[in-house]
């Protein structure tokens, strides 16, 4: 019975997207392929399969999105060792971000879609920039 519910749930529930504010310098690196990981202190729902990118400290617009290819979670040291080749962030900035944490999370960037015409938050019904992320459909 549980297996059936899980299977039914996966078929019938649309996958969600999450909107992440990401600094302009990191957005550029995601788009040019030099940043293959988006680091966070915790994951959003497993139902999310796409990250929508709000460029903070830049245009202040939604400029693209990427599919989540995988999720990694481990100690900050292990995540850094595994991802440093395409981190797109300095080692000191990485460890500063995760200071005092025993867990680091990383979204593996999959297919990237750069919007030809950037969108506003209002296009998604959002009036305030989320601090970490917000769910959208």
Model-derived segments and spans:
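Contiguous surface segments at macromolecular interaction interfaces
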Residues: 9-43, 47, 58-63, 71-137
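Non-catalytic, usually N-terminal nucleic-acid engagement modules in DNA/RNA processing proteins
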Residues: 52
């Amino acid at each position: 019975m549980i297996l059936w519910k899980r299977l039914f749930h996966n078929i019938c529930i649309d996958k969600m997207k999450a909107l992440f504010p990401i600094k302009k310098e990191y957005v550029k690196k995601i788009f040019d392929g030099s940043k293959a990981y988006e680091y966070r202190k915790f994951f959003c729902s497993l139902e999310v399969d796409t990250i929508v990118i709000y460029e903070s400290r830049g245009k202040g617009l939604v400029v693209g999105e990427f599919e989540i290819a995988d999720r990694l979670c481990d100690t900050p040291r292990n995540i850094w060792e595994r991802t440093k080749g395409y981190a797109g962030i300095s080692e000191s900035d990485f460890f500063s971000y995760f200071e005092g944490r025993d867990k680091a999370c990383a979204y593996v960037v999959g297919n990237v879609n750069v919007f030809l015409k950037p969108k506003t938050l209002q296009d998604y019904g959002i009036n305030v920039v989320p601090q970490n992320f917000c769910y959208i459909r």
